[in-house]
Amino acid sequence: MTAIQYQQGLCRLPIQLLLTVCCLNLSVLTAKAAPFSDVAESRVNYQKVIAGPKQTCRSLESMTTTEFTVVSARQENGACRVTGVIPREIRFEVILPDGWNGRMMMTGNGGLAGQPLEDENYRKTREHMLAQGFATVYTDTGHDNRIESGATFAYRSVDKLIDYGYRGVHLTSQAAKRIIKAYYRKAPKYNYFSGCSNGGRQALMAAQRFPDDFDGILAGAPANQFTGLKFSQAHRMKALKDDPLTLAEVKELAKHIYARCDDKDGLKDGVISDPRSCDFEPARDLPKCSGADLTTCFDEEEIEALTSFYSPIIVAGEEVYPAFPVGSEGEGANYGGVIAPGWMPWVINPAGRPLLDVLGSDFFRYIVFVQDNPAYDWSSFDFQTKPDNLEFTRAVLDATNPDLSAYKAGNGKLLSYFGWADPDINPLTAISYHDEVDAIVAGDVDDFYRLFMVPGMFHCSGGPGPSSFDAITPLINWVEKGIAPDQIIATHLENTQVLFSRPLCAHPKVAVYDGVGPVAEATSFQCQKL
């Protein structure tokens, strides 16, 4: 089976190339598996048409300004598709439906961005939003990953790194608003942003740096501790480099972890609801081999490697990323005939390089050192030393500023979600950021920012937990009607069939089984603060 087949099974999306960010293409609404599925229950009729075009689509080509150039404006399938470029190379697209609902929806990018405007996955996402009446917006953030794959766009280019870090999304949102207003003779009443992974980082960056850009922001699995994440990817790959685990060994590892932790929530259901309750130590809890290297036991080198794998990431004496919780080792549902653990193909990949290796290596070659070196071997990185470009990298790429006072003051609403079984980005970073915001912003953080942790969900979607849910509709209800979401009903699907449902609870509450009702039904669970 090829790496692409694995990714299709795990991510439920077609992928073109392993190096084009793979499953991180799930940054946009498709990662949610069920965007707009709750539209019928919405308190806002966001499908209602409020305006139509006030000029021809083609006439927008004359709208070029000093801030952006309109490259083309063409009528396609009941909408006006506008493409343009912002100096220097930030390409963007705005699609304007003939029947507009008065809202703008911008989608984020996965991984290291650069997905072209023609990218099939992103086009499908925008078409889905377009069908609801949104004017849709998208940008490649300043580079084309078909030409500059990975982080090669940052090779000796600080400007492109800044465009990727935050400038591309901001400038595109400004250009899009002008184009929308010109076409309909009416500005968007509400502006939204949605993204997962790097798209989640972009979402938090917008709230922190440009609080007036979006009224409602949906941030999924945000990679906001970007630099720490990259060190984590390298650390975990380095831990397993000399003695990589086989697929059989990962399944054996998962068996022992789930045997110890699955029922901590009172239910033995194949889902670790909150891995913080799980006390797992490889040296204590895994069977040790005596003699032959068998797949049902672990030798000393493997146990030592796993101990390092689950440890905090320390660089030059500073903890830059928390220890990874357990949970992503388990298998997800059967997608396209593939049953695989969450570690596949992130941590292990029989078909090629693990994704953590693919996604992390370019950070050391083109970003975190002043002197770029395309030949740099990340496995040689000395974690006792501090890279000479680290602080600048943090300033440009990390979205960790907890002071969201300006976003709150502007009545913005931030809804975030994160899978507890994410094999790439540590879910604990979402909780720590939420709690930091709570500590620094005056008033009740729940008034404008709510976080929903998703038990058993892998990176942005999939996994053994309830990973199919609509977070867009609750966000719109919150922004436009002031109805804050206390819970979101999620389901676990296999071949479009609902196997069970659970409520996702606003942090710090968690779903607790009432001990009476059917365990497959969300009504048998209550959101409680433990």
What are these regions (language model features)?
Residues 14-27:
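Bacterial N-terminal signal peptides
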Residues 34-103, 107, 115-124, 268, ...:
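Catalytic-loop region of hydrolases
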Residues 111-185, 231-232, 374-387, 394-396, ...:
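Cap/lid segment of the alpha/beta-hydrolase catalytic domain
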Residues 186-196:
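Alpha/beta-hydrolase fold nucleophile elbow
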Residues 195-199, 203:
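Gly/Ala-rich beta-loop-alpha elbow adjacent to hydrolase catalytic centers
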Residues 205-207, 212-314, 453:
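A catalytic-pocket lid/entrance helix-loop region that shapes and gates access to the active site
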Residues 416-418:
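Short beta-strand/loop motif that positions the catalytic acidic residue
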Residues 449-462:
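Histidine-bearing beta->alpha loop at or near hydrolase active sites
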